[in-house]
Amino acid sequence: MKSFIVVLCCLFAITYGQTDLPAIRRNARFQRNLALVALHNQIFGAEGVENGLAKTQEEKVCILNVKEAALEEGNIVLDETVGKIIPEVERLSTSGTEAEIKAFLDKTDYPAYKKSAMNEFKQKIMTWIPAVQGKMAACRK
């Protein structure tokens, strides 16, 4: 059920239109946070299952270490996909000139960008999460 709600929110974030920089800024942050929640659901869900099956403290520590590494790697994936546009939007929002902002808005098709970024994120995560689950399962002897 949680996954269904996250998917609905992702679709809403993708289809909601943006015409100005503040709207793009809000939506880019929202989309990144939404992707972060989806990532955490996958990683913490896998951790919960494996911790339930772990028999020793050593196995649980190993699972925790895999989870921490996965969270770090997941944040890198986020920054390379759905979060890629955020630094430029933040810079323009705080110190961009009118000409820079206009040029950015003219050259950026944000709805198409965010749809492709979210698809890229989902594709990377769906191929990466099974490997994380496998590493966690390998912690149990």
Swiss-Prot record:
**Tissue specificity annotation:** Expressed by the venom gland (posterior main gland) (at protein level).
Its lineage opens with: Eukaryota, Metazoa, Ecdysozoa, Arthropoda, Hexapoda
Q: What is this protein called?
A: Venom protein family 1 protein 1
What does the sequence similarity comment in the record state about its family?
A: Belongs to the insect vpf1 family.
Q: What is its main location?
A: secreted
GO CC, one annotated term: extracellular region
Arranged from A to Z, the UniProt key words for this protein are: Disulfide bond, Secreted, Signal
Q: Where is the signal peptide?
A: 1-17
Instruction: Enumerate the subcellular locations listed in this protein's record, separating them with semicolons.
Output: Secreted
Disulfide partners: 62-139
